Amino acid sequence: MTIRDATLSDSAEIAALTTQLGYPTETDAITGRLAKIAGQREQLVLVAVLENTVAGWLQAHACEVIESGFRAEILGLVVGQSCRRQGVGRRLVARAEQWAIEIGAETLVVRSNTKRVESHSFYPALGFQASKTQAVYRKRLEADPNQFLRQRPIGDLGR
């Protein structure tokens, strides 16, 4: 098994895995998202490759949080159904943890949907501790997702 940075050529397999997880996604959408975050130091997108096939992917990002400091967070982790229980997820998380340490993150956070029962034993087995239960609220916005790229640099608070 090889763990490596995702590339645009992985888009179709990442889309298929994402759809398998229950989030139907088109290849073009994944390609566009990967292109937007390519080269951003605070973003990490990895794939696990088994026998020339993407068996899983992980996305993490790092940010400074006012109340809790600099942290990394796993935003998504998907392992194909046929590749589960083979160490794919464990290896992806280990690489994300290594990255988080390298960039100086104080903690690595992951959120897990309550309906993903398997993950509730997976993360504690890797040393994660449940820290809270929360409700997540979402509001769909009518916005141009490319607008962010045209905004002032992050960190410029109008000084």
Describe each model-derived feature in a short phrase.
Residues 90, 102, 114-133, 139:
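Conserved active-site alpha-helix within GNAT-family acetyltransferase domains
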Residues 20, 85, 98-102, 129:
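Conserved amphipathic alpha-helical interaction elements at protein-protein interfaces in regulatory
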Residues 62-65, 79-82, 115-117, 142-144:
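Short coil/turn motifs at secondary-structure junctions
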Residues 1-9, 143-159:
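Conserved N-terminal entry element of GNAT/NAT acetyltransferase domains
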Residues 5-70, 75, 80, 156-157:
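Acetyl-CoA-dependent GNAT
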Residues 93, 100-112:
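Conserved GNAT acetyl-CoA-binding A-motif
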Residues 79, 85-98, 125:
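Conserved acetyl-CoA-binding loop-helix of GNAT-fold acetyltransferases
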